[in-house]
């Protein structure tokens, strides 16, 4: 009974006051192995309990945060949609009508950098938005600058050839026309005054060469023409030539020094004058050669060998 009472008393004692039961000898290792698992059980239970207790908190927290998350998700979706919309808007081109382009071009010709107020006015006139007008002016200025730059590059690249050709052309004119006419043709007109100073004896035998130079009527009247020359006039030719040269008046000299008769000047009709003078000089020389050969004056043509081709032909 006492033992029963003692057992009853131990059973009635609270669990915290009960002494631990003595471990059996054969169950020692199993007890030690199972012992560390004992404290884990309450941890797992506590973890499970904490998870159980936290789940409703998350559920409770998820309930108020749901709209925010959904709102954030909505904004996120909206944010994802907005860039797509913006990209689509950027890729979308604005097709301007001819009237709008005319108005924009006219305004661009007047002012290439319109301010905000002017752009707004243009937008009202053209039925466009102000950003679209601003973008159009920006693109138009870029196109204008590119065109100006290309024009400057073209001028710089092609500027050397016109300058070179401009420098060459005057020289070609000088050598082709100026040199061949102004010098050679002038020499064909100039042998009379040169020969009167250097070759007086030869000039005395050819008064027609001076006639080609002095075109004054008085000098022509004082000289004999080739048609009037005959065999009877040849013996008196030296004296008549010297008399004609000595009888030249100031008027004939002034006419010889006039700009029209100047050997370095350009006559009004150069080719016709040059052709006439060449024909007359050649005809006179042929006539004189025939006359000199007929009267035995062939030796008088010796001084002509010292002249150049231009003076000899004249």
Curated annotation (Swiss-Prot):
Localization per record: Nucleus
Compositionally biased region (Basic and acidic residues): 55-68
Residues annotated with N-acetylmethionine modification: 1
Pfam family, any one: OAR
Cysteine disulfide partners in this protein: none
Positions of short motif Nuclear localization signal: 286-290
DNA-binding region: 89-148
Start and end residues of each stretch annotated as Interaction with PIT-1: 147-279
Annotated protein name in UniProt: Pituitary homeobox 1
UniProt lineage: Eukaryota, Metazoa, Chordata, Craniata, Vertebrata
Protein encoded by which gene: PITX1
